[in-house]
Design a protein with these regions (language model features):
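Short, well-structured active-site flanking segments
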Residues: 85-105, 151-156, 206-210
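Mid-domain, small-residue-enriched loop/turn segments at the edges of structured enzyme/sensor domains
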Residues: 121, 142-201
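Structured C-terminal helix/loop/strand segments within mature extracytoplasmic catalytic/sensor domains
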Residues: 29-40, 146-147, 151, 194-225, ...
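Active-site SXXK
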Residues: 58, 70-100, 132, 267
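Bacterial N-terminal signal peptides
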Residues: 10-22
Length: 302
């Protein structure tokens, strides 16, 4: 079956309209807060979705959250949760060795592991997970999908965790072969924050695997000019980025920001179909994160 961009975008909007709310909002954001976020979002010639929530109070602010956005590599965070769930269950072992053959390393895709080991080799599950999360390797991503039974497994996990508004339908290789499929791998910003919150509260993983994934995300090597771009070094950012193909279909960053006082904020920013450059999109993401951390009333309350 051939999917068109308009069809997939339409599916996203319908799915979004039918999905139930996933983030309880304790207090509505002041109008000034919403206006400030909208001003940043409207500075780009793009569709921008941003949602932030203080994890201790539930106070939230959002713009463009009625739309589902293509995740691109952000979905590797969701995949990592599914893999580590099976580690917790004993079905997988972080130290188990996985043999990768040369023909499994697709050439025309982002793959730091292939660049280092073009002939493949033997790797621990832990290392493949690290390369997938921290370096956003597309080949190791698809190997992990195959290991747990495909994208359907991840979608079932999301349902089990009570998360609606996130869709994981296609692998990296499938999106590479048909770029329009990226629109089916979608998320609303607040839905991603719901997943980040469940992860942080220990509702998905055991303590050891939760800490492992947190450390991997805190050491993310991609997108350093996005959420982290304008924050001082005393802010910890555990995050996962996502980027589109040759056209600026997606410039994303999602994660948890730990403020110097120890408070935590889940933030998800998705930029879709931008007519501006990737650096311009990244600058806006960085500005949003800085505003949230330094000027948003909910963050400054304690």
């Amino acid at each position: 079956m051939t999917f068109t961009g308009s069809f997939l975008r339409g599916c996203m909007v319908c799915s979004c309209a039918l999905s139930l709310g996933v983030m309880p909002v304790v207090a509505a954001s002041p109008a000034a807060d919403s206006a400030a976020v909208q001003k940043l979002a409207h500075s780009l010639k793009a569709r921008v979705g941003m949602a932030a929530v203080m994890l201790d109070t539930g106070e939230a602010v959002a713009v463009g959250d009625e739309t589902a956005y293509p995740m691109q590599s952000v979905f590797k965070f969701v995949l990592a949760l599914s893999v580590l769930k099976r580690v917790d269950q004993g079905a997988l072992n972080l130290e188990q060795i996985i043999h990768i053959r040369p023909e499994q390393l697709v050439k025309d895709t982002w793959s730091p592991l292939r660049e280092r080991f073009p002939q493949g080799g033997d790797f621990s599950l832990k290392e493949l997970l690290r390369v997938t999360v921290q370096e956003s390797d597309n080949n190791t991503c698809d190997l992990l999908f195959a290991l747990i039974g495909g994208t359907e497994t991840v979608q079932k996990d999301l349902k089990e965790w009570g998360i609606s508004g996130i869709n994981v339908r296609f692998t990296e290789d499938e999106m590479l072969r048909n770029h329009e499929l990226q629109y089916a791998n979608s998320s609303r910003p607040s839905a991603m924050n719901a997943l980040l919150r469940a992860f942080d509260e220990g509702k998905i993983l055991n303590k050891d695997t939760q800490r492992l994934l947190w450390d991997m995300m805190a050491g993310c090597a991609t997108g350093t000019t996005r959420l982290k771009g304008k924050l001082p070094q005393d802010y910890v950012v555990a995050h996962k980025t996502g980027s589109g193909f040759t056209v600026i279909t997606a410039v994303n960053d999602v994660g948890i920001i730990v403020l110097p006082n120890g408070r935590k904020m889940a933030v998800s920013v998705f930029v879709m179909d931008s007519k501006d450059s990737a650096p311009a999109c990244e600058k806006v993401i960085a500005s949003m994160a800085r505003w949230l951390c330094t000027e948003w009333q909910a963050a400054a309350a304690k």
